[in-house]
């Protein structure tokens, strides 16, 4: 987890990272991940003695490198961004992946959807409408989700069908996100969005299961994750 000093690019004593590696999960496993786990807070439980107590009012900052590659194929062209968001937001249906990265993946899927561009018809597969994007960079996220687990440089790939109203097709996503331990300043993740595609940011974020609020400064903060999406 990056400190606020690192986010703002302030110098300080460098600390050696103690984060441990986490192997990617076996994607062939059939166990359902559709539940909301909650960590115990009783200090007598295993592994809890040094765990940070979750405080929903405590603002934290996470700094990271990210890459998102997205391809969306639909049976017909999307008319509005709302149509795009309704389709792409189904990317994590029956999610099996690194649980600690899921909130960040939701943000990357939201980000990618705002930057989608139509593939020229002559290049599309059998003339089927196709959209693509490739975004990468460094960013930080202000949030109130408590202490986050270590994030290593391990790409994960997701392929999901969607069938929303008049639209049906497939979503292909490859996402990578990992901790940035540098002292260099980074922009907020929201700065990478193409905000010209929509004006109701809070409403569109909720379509991806992201509950966001504005700070007094006007900056968006990720408050929590909706378990209904």
UniProtKB/Swiss-Prot annotation:
Phosphorylated by host. It is a peripheral membrane protein. Residues 1-10 have a biased composition (Low complexity). One of its GO terms (biological process) is phosphorylation. Disulfide bonds: none annotated. GO terms for cellular component: host cell cytoplasm; host cell nuclear membrane; membrane; viral envelope. Changing residue 51 to R: Complete loss of mRNA nuclear export inhibition. Loss of ability to inhibit host transcription. Gene3D superfamilies: VSV matrix protein (3.10.460.10). Late-budding domains (L domains) are short sequence motifs essential for viral particle budding. They recruit proteins of the host ESCRT machinery (Endosomal Sorting Complex Required for Transport) or ESCRT-associated proteins. M contains two overlapping L domains: a PPXY motif which interacts with the WW domain 3 of NEDD4 and a PTAP/PSAP motif, which interacts with the UEV domain of TSG101. Belongs to the vesiculoviruses matrix protein family. Forms a double layer around the helical nucleocapsid, the inner matrix layer binding to the N helix and the outer matrix layer binding to the envelope glycoprotein. Plays a major role in assembly and budding of virion, by recruiting cellular partners of the ESCRT complexes that play a key role in releasing the budding particle from the host membrane. Condensates the ribonucleocapsid core during virus assembly. Homomultimer. Interacts with viral nucleocapsid; this interaction contributes to the virion assembly. Interacts with the viral envelope glycoprotein; this interaction contributes to the virion assembly. Interacts with host RAE1-NUP98 complex. Interacts with host NEDD4 and TSG101. Interacts with host dynamin. Interacts with host NDUFAF4; the interaction inhibits viral propagation and is independent of interferon activation. Interacts with host GTF2H5; the interaction may inhibit host transcription. This is Matrix protein. It comes from Vesicular stomatitis Indiana virus (strain San Juan). The lineage of its organism: Viruses, Riboviria, Orthornavirae, Negarnaviricota, Haploviricotina. The gene is M.
């Amino acid at each position: 987890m990056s400190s606020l000093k690192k986010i703002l690019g302030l110098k300080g004593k460098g600390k050696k990272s103690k984060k441990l590696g986490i192997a990617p999960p076996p994607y062939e496993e059939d166990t359902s991940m559709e539940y909301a786990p909650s960590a115990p807070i009783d200090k007598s439980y295993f592994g809890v003695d040094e765990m940070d107590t979750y405080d929903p009012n405590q603002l934290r900052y996470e700094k990271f490198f990210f890459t998102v590659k997205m391809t969306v194929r639909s049976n017909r062209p999307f008319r509005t961004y709302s149509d795009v968001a309704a389709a792409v937001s189904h990317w994590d249906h029956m999610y099996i992946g690194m649980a600690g990265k899921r909130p960040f993946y939701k943000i990357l899927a939201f980000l990618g959807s705002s930057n989608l561009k139509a593939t020229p018809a002559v290049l599309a597969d059998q003339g089927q409408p196709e959209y693509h994007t490739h975004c990468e960079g460094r960013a930080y996220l202000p949030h109130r989700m408590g202490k986050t687990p270590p994030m290593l440089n391990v790409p994960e790939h997701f392929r999901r069908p969607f069938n929303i109203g008049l639209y049906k097709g497939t979503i292909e996503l490859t996402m990578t996100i990992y901790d940035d331990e540098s002292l260099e300043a980074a922009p907020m993740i929201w700065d990478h969005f193409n905000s010209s595609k929509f004006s109701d940011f809070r409403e569109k974020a909720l379509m991806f299961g992201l509950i966001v609020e504005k700070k007094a400064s006007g900056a968006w903060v990720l408050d929590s994750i909706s378990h209904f999406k």
